[in-house]
C-alpha cells in the first residue's frame, strides 16, 4: 500500500525522523488559510501516489497566502501521470544548503534488504544511477543485525555525504530503518534529505526529511491494525473495497459476465474462455476477476456473490471450481447456502462448472437443490458459452 507524502510524514514524526509536517487541504482557500497561519513562505505540494510531481508542476513555492491560493488553484485537478490531484500539503518553505537521497527497500533478487544513499539528492534517483552510478551507494543490510548508528554512519559515508553531517545523518538513517521494520514497510524513501544552511560558528545546519515516500506491506495488515487509516477509500472502487473487507482477490472490469474461480490460474483461464465465448455473443466481456483461493465455504461464496452481483453491469455469473483440498461437495453446499443467505439479492443466473475431488457428490447437491438461478454445466467451454449467451439476453 503506497502512502501519500503527508501520511509518510506522519510515520516519520512517529519514529522521530526530523522534518516539517505541514497541513493537508483539498481547496485553494484552505491552502491560503494554512499559509496565513504559518506566517512564512510555503511550499504547496500535490498529494499523489507517484513521482515526478515537481516536473509536472505539482510542487510550487508561495511567498504569500495569496500566492498559495493561486498555486493551489493551479495544482488542484492537475493530471500527474494519470493521478488527479485532489489534496494538497502546505508546508513551511525550508532553506536548503545541500540535498541528499536515502532509501530502504526489499532487494528481492538477492533476498535481502537494501539501503541506498547518495549525495546527489533532489533529482530522480534513476537518473543518478544512470549518469553518476559512483555517487549512489547500494548497501546490503543484514535482516538480523539491522541498522545501528555505526552501520548508518557507514551507509552515509558510502553515499559520499560530507563529514560534518555524518553524525546527524546517521541518526536519521537509523530512525528510518526503525520505521521500515516497525511499520512492515517494503519501501521508505527520502528525497530530498536536506542539510539546512549553517547558523553560526560550529554549526553544520540541520538534517531534515523534506519529502517522503513509504510503501507498506499489505500482507502485514493482520499485525498492523493502525494502517487501515491510511487506506484511500475514496480512490478505491466500492466493490473492490467490499471484497477487500472479506479478503477476496477481486478486480472490477467493464464486462457483463461475473467470474468466480478458485485459484489464480483457473480464474485467469476462465477469464480467457469467457472473453473468447463473448466474441461469439455480441462482444460480451468478463466483468471481473475474483479468486476465492482455497476456501469456498458458504460465507466466502456468499461474500463473493454479493460482490459480483453488486455490479449493475453483470448479467450472468460463471462459477468455475476445481475441487482439490476444498472438495466439490463442500463448494456445492457453499453455493446453496450462499443463495439462501443472499435471498432476493441473488437475482442473476449462475452458470456452475465443477470438476475434481468429489465432483459427483457436488453435482448431486446442486441438482437436488434445484435452484432456479443455478445451471450446472459439465465443461468449462460450455459453461463460458452459456454464461456469455445469458449475459447477452
Curated annotation (Swiss-Prot):
Primary role: Succinyl-CoA synthetase functions in the citric acid cycle (TCA), coupling the hydrolysis of succinyl-CoA to the synthesis of either ATP or GTP and thus represents the only step of substrate-level phosphorylation in the TCA. The beta subunit provides nucleotide specificity of the enzyme and binds the substrate succinate, while the binding sites for coenzyme A and phosphate are found in the alpha subunit.
**Residue sites binding ATP per the record:** 45, 52-54, 94, 99
Q: Which family does it belong to?
A: Belongs to the succinate/malate CoA ligase beta subunit family.
**What biological process terms from GO does the record include?**
succinyl-CoA metabolic process; tricarboxylic acid cycle
The protein here is known as Succinate--CoA ligase [ADP-forming] subunit beta
Q: Name one GO molecular function term.
A: magnesium ion binding
Q: Where is the ATP-grasp domain?
A: 9-242
Documented EC number(s): 6.2.1.5
Which SUPFAM superfamilies does this entry report, sorted A to Z?
Glutathione synthetase ATP-binding domain-like (SSF56059), Succinyl-CoA synthetase domains (SSF52210)
Required cofactor names = Mg(2+)
Assembly and partners? Heterotetramer of two alpha and two beta subunits.
Amino acid at each position: 500500500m503506497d502512502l501519500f507524502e503527508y501520511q509518510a510524514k506522519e510515520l516519520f514524526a512517529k519514529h522521530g525522523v526530523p522534518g516539517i509536517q505541514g497541513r493537508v487541504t483539498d481547496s485553494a482557500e484552505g491552502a491560503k488559510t494554512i499559509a496565513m497561519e504559518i506566517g512564512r513562505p510555503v511550499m504547496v505540494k500535490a498529494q499523489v501516489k507517484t513521482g515526478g510531481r515537481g516536473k509536472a508542476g505539482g510542487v510550487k513555492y508561495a511567498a504569500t497566502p495569496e500566492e498559495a491560493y493561486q498555486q493551489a488553484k493551479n495544482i488542484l485537478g492537475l493530471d500527474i501521470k494519470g493521478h488527479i490531484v485532489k489534496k494538497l500539503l502546505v508546508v513551511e518553505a525550508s532553506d536548503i544548503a545541500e540535498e541528499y537521497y536515502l532509501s530502504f527497500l526489499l532487494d528481492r533478487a538477492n533476498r535481502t534488504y537494501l539501503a541506498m544513499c547518495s549525495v546527489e539528492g533532489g533529482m530522480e534517483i534513476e537518473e543518478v544511477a544512470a549518469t553518476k552510478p559512483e555517487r549512489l551507494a547500494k548497501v546490503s543490510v543484514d535482516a538480523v543485525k539491522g541498522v545501528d548508528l555505526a552501520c548508518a554512519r557507514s551507509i552515509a559515508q558510502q553515499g559520499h555525504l560530507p563529514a560534518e553531517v555524518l553524525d546527524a545523518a546517521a541518526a536519521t538513517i537509523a530512525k528510518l530503518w526503525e520505521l521500515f521494520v516497525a511499520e512492515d514497510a517494503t519501501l521508505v524513501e527520502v528525497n530530498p534529505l536536506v542539510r539546512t544552511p549553517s547558523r553560526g560558528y560550529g554549526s553544520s545546519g540541520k538534517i531534515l526529511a523534506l519529502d517522503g515516500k513509504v510503501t507498506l506491506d499489505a500482507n502485514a495488515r493482520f499485525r498492523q491494525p493502525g494502517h487501515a487509516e491510511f487506506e484511500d477509500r475514496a480512490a478505491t472502487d466500492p466493490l473492490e473495497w467490499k471484497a477487500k473487507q472479506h479478503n477476496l482477490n477481486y478486480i472490477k472490469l467493464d464486462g457483463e459476465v461475473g467470474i468466480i474461480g478458485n485459484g489464480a490460474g483457473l480464474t485467469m483461464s476462465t477469464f480467457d474462455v469467457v472473453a473468447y465465448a463473448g466474441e461469439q455473443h455480441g462482444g460480451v466481456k468478463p466483468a471481473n476477476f475474483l479468486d476465492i483461493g482455497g476456501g469456498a465455504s458458504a460465507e466466502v461464496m456468499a461474500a463473493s456473490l454479493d460482490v459480483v452481483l453488486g455490479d449493475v453491469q453483470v448479467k450472468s455469473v460463471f462459477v468455475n471450481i476445481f475441487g482439490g483440498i476444498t472438495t466439490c461437495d463442500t463448494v456445492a453446499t457453499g453455493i446453496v447456502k450462499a443463495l439462501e443467505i443472499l435471498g432476493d439479492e441473488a437475482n442473476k443466473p449462475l452458470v456452475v462448472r465443477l470438476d475434481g475431488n468429489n465432483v459427483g457428490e457436488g453435482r448431486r447437491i446442486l441438482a437436488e437443490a434445484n435452484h432456479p438461478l443455478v445451471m450446472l454445466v459439465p465443461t468449462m467451454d460450455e459453461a463460458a458459452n452459456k454464461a456469455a449467451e445469458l449475459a447477452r439476453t
